[in-house]
Structure formats: C-alpha cells, structure tokens
C-alpha cells in the first residue's frame, strides 16, 4: 500500500507524541535559562543527543524487528533479562507513574494552591488520568488516530500559544552560567544525553511498527523504510519544538534568574504573560504531554509482556500496569525512583551500544562483536555505577575516576570503544583462522 502525505504526517505526529513527555518539556527551557547568551550553541549540542539518539534508536529497533531480537545478538540470556529490565524500569518502575505525578504538580499549582486535601485530589487525578490513558492504550494499532489526529495537534497548539506570548513580551537573555561559558556545545551534548530518550526509542519501536502495519504496510523492508522516515520527521519536529522552548527559557531566565528547574522557568513566564490563565495553559500542556507519553508506555509495556506471557491478555496487562502506576504515583514514587534511576543509568550505555551495533555488519560477519561489546559495556557500566555508589575499594574507584569523561557520566565510553575494537578484531582473526 502506498502511503499518502497525510498518513506520513499522522505517523510523524504520533511518534513525536510518544517521545514528548514532561521531561522533554522542561529540559530545553532550563538549559536556556542556564546558558543565557550561549543558548544556541548549547542547544545545538543538546539536539545532537536528545534528537539524534531517539531517531537512531527507532531505526535500529525496526531494523532488528524488536528489542528482544536486537538484544539476542549479544546472547540468549542477555535477551531474556535486558529487555525485561528496560520495560520495567522505564514503564511501571519510573516513567508511567511519573507522568501522573508530574502533571498533577502543575495542575495543583494552577488550580489547587493552598488546598489541604492535596493527597485526596492527587488520588482522584491519578485514577482519572490512568483510566483515560488505559482506554486509549487498549488499541495500540490505533494510536495514530488518537495521538496523531487529536492529542499531538492539541499539544502543539498549546505550546504555540505559550511561544507567541513569549514573543509578545521580549526580554534579553541573561549571562551564561559557569558550565555553559567555555564549552556550551559540549555541555548541551551532555544535557541531551541525560534525557535518556534512546531507551524510549527501543521501547516505542515495536508500537511504531504495529501502527505502520495498521496503515496497510506488510513488507518488512517497507516498514523499516517508513519507520526511518517517520523517525526523522518526528526528530525534526522535536528539534523545532525544543528551539521554541529554549527561546522561552532564555527570555524567562533573563527576566527572572535563579529558577531551580524547567517547570519553574516556564511557570514564571506563563504567569507573567497570561496571569492565572497562563498557569492553566501550562498545566494543560503538561497534562497532554504526559498523557501522550503514558499511553505510549502503557501500550509498549503491555505489548511486550503479552508477547512473553500470552496467556495474560493485552488489556489485562494494560489494566495491571495502570493500577500499579496509580499506587506508585501516590505513595511510593520516590522509593521506586531510587531503584529505577540506577537501573536506567546501568542500562543506558548498553542501549547506546546496541543502537550503534545495529548499523554495523550482522553477527555472521563479526560473530564476536555483539557478545564482547555487549557484555563488556555492561561490566564497565556496572563498575562505574558501583564506584559512584561507594561500594568498591578505594583503589579501584580511584582507578575508574581517571577515565576520560568520568565526571560527566560518560566514563563508560572509552572502555566501550575498546570492547568494540576487541570484538571486531577477534572476529576477523577467527575468520582468517
């Protein structure tokens, strides 16, 4: 089936909706508020990682078929554990509950300030929020109709209203904070790395492929090609929205310096330009952005676990994850974050390595590349995480701290490159022997 421009636009909007959650909303304005006059070089670095990694991730997982098949190139045991940890950590263990708690904070700030019954309101909000998200997620092959046609255009319109208000109240950018004064591109690159959206790309890849099939595509090559085009299109849209949010942050940071986070940066400008209506506008932006991401995560996680345990129906998995997320978002989010964030920090380097390997020759050509690079990066990532937790001997910790980019959280990079070279070299030697 030949896709029309309308179909492609719907898929681009759908992919954008899946990625653009609360974190994506607050990172760029906070970066700009900090970077001040160096906002644009910092945003160039930010977009390289915050846009580039997710696009490459979508293309990588659709090339492989799904995350399980991609991980199986390392080892069957690796494929049994790695995707499970990814889905649990980024799903009910972190991102799904946080969509409700983060958006509720903005709703409470706009409409419930001073209320003595915030816990009760939060419970009611989370029940409604996850009920709506769960109902939308019940048909994963129809996300283009719900996200692409309705929720994403609504989100873009709301962000556009905030951006126009910023243009009507211009203010010069402030001075750059110390971290952005000398190497703003590198600092922006590191900030984009911290979004960890590449993990979401591996999770969303299968849902994107499912929606392409629902639009009439059946051949694997056609699905890979269209997923790549949709990923690039969504990446361009992400970049444009990030730049708009960065301008908002630059203006807000110049007018009201000292904000502690991106939500505060946005709140100061929205309240100044639109008053109470501005806070309602900002709350609506957060709710729609978080709802979009929640739908995508519920659908992706339920699809994965239904494939692994088909005796439990897909709707049952959606309901289970929604109910778990209601509980965590109300009573245990900080505790679950304490567990999930280290797990994500452990897995993120491996995610980036798998994405890179997906574009290199297949395992038949370099049979030792995936196992050595995958297991080696896992070992390096675990050692670095243990060092930061203070559980390694002092001598070993001191040795790890001399690795390049250790302080920036990229200490795994040099060991990873060594393991990649080792895997490729040993594979070539094995072929010659």
Language model features: what each stretch is:
Residues 52, 56, 154-166, 200, ...:
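Selective recognition of specific alpha-helical transmembrane segments in multi-pass small-molecule
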Residues 68-72, 241-291, 298, 307, ...:
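TM-loop-TM module centered on a large, flexible mid-protein loop between adjacent transmembrane helices
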Residues 62-70, 129-151, 214-217, 326-339, ...:
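Membrane-water interface regions at transmembrane-helix termini and the short interhelical loops
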Residues 352-421, 432-433:
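C-terminal membrane-solvent junction of multi-pass transporters and transport-like membrane proteins
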Residues 10-20, 165-172, 181-245, 278-290, ...:
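Hydrophobic, membrane-embedded alpha-helices of multi-pass small-molecule transporters
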Residues 136-166, 340-352, 372-378:
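Membrane-interface loop-to-helix entry segments
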Residues 31, 101-121, 213-214, 294-320:
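Helix-loop-helix connectors at the membrane interface of multi-pass transporters/channels
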Residues 92, 96, 156-181, 198-199, ...:
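Hydrophobic alpha-helical segments and their helix-loop junctions in multi-pass secondary transporters
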């Amino acid at each position: 089936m030949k896709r029309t421009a309308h179909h492609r636009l719907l898929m681009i909007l759908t992919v954008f909706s899946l990625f653009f959650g609360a974190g994506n909303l607050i990172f760029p304005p906070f970066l700009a508020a900090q970077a001040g006059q160096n906002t644009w070089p910092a945003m160039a670095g930010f977009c390289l990682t915050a846009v580039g990694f997710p696009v490459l991730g979508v293309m990588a997982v659709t090339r492989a078929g799904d995350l399980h098949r991609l991980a199986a190139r390392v080892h069957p045991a690796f494929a049994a554990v790695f995707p499970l940890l990814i889905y649990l950590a980024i799903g009910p263990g972190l991102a799904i509950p946080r969509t409700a708690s983060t958006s509720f904070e903005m709703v409470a700030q706009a409409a419930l300030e001073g209320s003595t019954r915030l816990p009760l309101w939060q419970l009611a909000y989370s029940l409604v929020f996850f009920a709506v998200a769960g109902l939308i997620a019940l048909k994963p092959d129809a996300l283009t109709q719900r996200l692409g046609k309705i929720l994403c255009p609504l989100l873009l319109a709301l962000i556009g209203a905030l951006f126009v208000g910023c243009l009507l109240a211009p203010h010069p950018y402030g001075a750059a904070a110390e971290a952005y004064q000398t190497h703003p591109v590198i600092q922006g690159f590191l900030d984009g790395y911290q979004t960890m959206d590449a993990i979401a790309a591996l999770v969303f890849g299968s849902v994107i492929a499912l929606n392409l099939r629902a639009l009439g595509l059946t051949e694997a090559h056609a699905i890979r090609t269209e997923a790549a085009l949709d990923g690039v299109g969504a990446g361009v849209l992400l970049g444009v929205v990030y730049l708009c949010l960065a301008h908002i942050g630059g203006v807000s940071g110049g007018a009201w310096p000292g904000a502690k986070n991106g939500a505060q940066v946005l709140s100061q400008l929205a309240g100044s330009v639109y008053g109470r209506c501005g806070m309602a506008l900002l709350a609506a932006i957060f709710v729609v952005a978080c709802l979009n991401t929640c739908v995508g995560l519920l659908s992706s996680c339920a699809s994965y676990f239904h494939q692994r345990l088909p005796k439990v129906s897909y709707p049952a998995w959606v309901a289970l994850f929604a109910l778990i997320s209601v509980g965590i978002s109300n009573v245990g989010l900080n505790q679950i974050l304490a567990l999930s964030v280290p797990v994500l920090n452990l897995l993120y380097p491996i995610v980036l390595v798998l994405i890179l390997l997906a574009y290199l020759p297949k395992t038949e050509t370099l049979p030792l590349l995936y196992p050595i690079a995958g297991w080696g990066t896992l070992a390096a990532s675990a050692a670095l995480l243990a060092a930061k937790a203070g559980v390694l001997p002092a001598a070993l910790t001191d040795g790890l701290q001399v690795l390049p980019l250790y302080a920036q959280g990229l200490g795994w990079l040099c060991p990873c490159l060594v393991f990649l070279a080792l895997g490729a070299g040993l594979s070539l030697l094995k072929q010659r022997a």
